[in-house]
Design a protein with these regions (language model features):
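Short secondary-structure junction/hinge motifs that connect adjacent elements
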Residues: 14-23, 37-44
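Glycine-rich beta-alpha junction loops
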Residues: 129-134, 183-186, 222-226, 268-270, ...
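Charged (often Lys/Glu-rich) extended helix/loop segments that serve as interaction or gating elements
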Residues: 1, 249-252, 257-406
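Active-site-proximal beta-alpha core segment in soluble small-molecule metabolic enzymes
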Residues: 35-217, 226, 247
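Glycine-rich phosphate/ribose-binding loops and adjacent secondary-structure elements
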Residues: 91, 186-188, 203, 210-276
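Short, small-residue-biased leader/transition segments that mark boundaries at the very start
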Residues: 3-8
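A non-catalytic, amphipathic alpha-helix used as a structural packing/dimerization or gating element
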Residues: 16-24, 164, 199, 243
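An N-terminal, well-structured beta->alpha segment
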Residues: 12-21, 28-29, 52-56
């Protein structure tokens, strides 16, 4: 019944899965009274999902004007927004300030730029830290690390710069300070957050002693990953939360900072496993390889083409059949990297079969684009009662042409 309700090339999300995951996260950090998750809007900027997560206690991590506007229209404002941006235009700082968001400064030069942009310095403010070098957990890391070389990353301030920023911001009227850092993406290790926490907790204790500022929160940002391959172990958020708690007790509490609130900015972890792209097999091609052409393309899911990322694929109705056929699963873009899978072993695929591409609930639809004049597909929400709700309609040619001047 649900299959008949779904159009071709739809993205569908699991409400129950998202809610239960948000509750597990909240429970894992319940030991910290000020804890708050700011969902990374860039991962899935769809109002129904933002509202759903807000009902579960999550705020919004925004990084652009339109993300701020989406949050506002969802009724999420004030300190329920963390504005973490870089190379930021003045008008975006002005919008964030108007909404009462917590502003996270990416660079020392933004201290004066922010004051010029909004006419003052907020009483509560955050600065992003980049320790430089190469971040490693001292073990073999699984999964595709998008950024684990902070010294080569454009984000954040050096140790000396963040100390100077705190001193200057304090003199300009700031009263509450936060520290933020993001060192690695999609980590499959329960040790990542605890390791990052120790770095930031130690830094906070040092900065408090050096500058005398009141540090009221530490933002661990994102980076907790998901297993895109079935054989990969999932992170255990309860174990992660306990690891962060131990670091908190060992570093912050002895420094007299046992009241510091913890924030996170998880995106992929929150919704990634609970979204799927459904596409139909419409062509087969037999040349030097075996190809299955589907009606979705990289415009619907860019990650395999852009990063070479693996997304598991299920052929609906053939879950128990032997995977004895090797295929490239391709879209119709005029780009040879428009492939969802390369040399993938799957059951025999017949024309008309529905293929489910897994773990597309974050950085999937949101990274879509219109190359070749392709139109973005619809988004659906599988409700807890089993019904399916349209949460974003499919684009039409009229949408595509609307900005053109003929």
């Amino acid at each position: 019944r649900r299959q008949r309700q779904m159009c071709i090339r739809d993205s569908i999300y699991d409400e129950q899965g998202i809610r239960e995951n948000a509750r597990r996260l909240r429970k894992a950090f319940a030991w910290n009274p000020g804890y708050r998750e700011y969902f990374a809007v860039k991962a899935a900027p769809t109002p129904a999902l933002l509202k759903l997560l807000h009902e579960e206690g999550c705020g919004c991590d925004c990084s652009s004007m339109t993300e701020l506007m989406i949050s506002e229209r969802c009724g999420i404002t004030g300190e329920n927004i963390m504005f973490s941006s870089n190379d930021t235009p003045a008008e975006e700082f002005q919008m964030a300030d108007r909404l009462g968001a917590i502003i996270n400064l990416d660079d020392l030069t933004l201290v004066d730029y922010l004051e010029r942009s909004i006419g003052h310095v907020p009483e509560k403010i955050c600065c992003r830290y980049n320790p430089g070098g190469v971040f490693t957990l001292g073990e073999t890391r699984e999964g595709f690390q998008v950024m684990d070389n902070p010294g080569d990353a454009k984000y954040g301030m050096t140790r000396a710069q963040i100390a100077e920023a705190f001193t200057r911001l304090s003199a300009m009227g700031a009263k509450e300070f936060g520290i933020h850092a993001f060192l690695a993406s999609n980590t499959l290790s329960n040790d990542y957050y605890p390791a990052l926490a120790r770095i930031l907790f130690q830094l906070a204790a040092e900065l408090k002693a050096e500058t005398g500022v009141h540090i009221t929160f530490i933002n661990l940002s994102g980076g907790v990953g998901i297993p895109y391959r079935p054989e990969q172990p999932a992170n255990d958020i309860a174990v992660i939360g306990e690891g962060v708690r131990r670091a908190y007790e060992e570093v912050l509490v002895p420094a007299g900072m046992g009241d510091v609130a913890l924030y996170t900015e998880l995106g992929r972890f929150m919704t990634g496993p609970y979204g799927h792209l459904v596409t139909r097999a419409i062509h087969e091609k037999h040349i030097y390889k075996e190809y299955i052409g589907v009606d979705a393309c990289a415009c619907n899911l860019m990650r395999p083409a852009m990063y070479g990322s693996y997304h598991h694929i299920t052929v609906m109705g053939k879950e128990d059949q032997l995977c004895d056929h090797k295929y490239d699963i391709a879209g119709s873009l005029c780009e040879n990297n428009d492939k969802f899978a390369v040399d993938r072993m799957l059951p025999k695929i017949d024309m008309g079969d529905l293929l489910v591409i897994h773990d597309t609930g974050a950085h999937g639809f949101s990274m879509g684009y219109n190359y070749n004049g392709k139109l973005r597909s619809a988004e659906l929400l599988l409700k807890e009662d089993g019904s399916v709700e349209l949460i974003r309609r499919a684009e039409t040619p009229e949408d595509y042409f609307r900005t053109l001047v003929w």
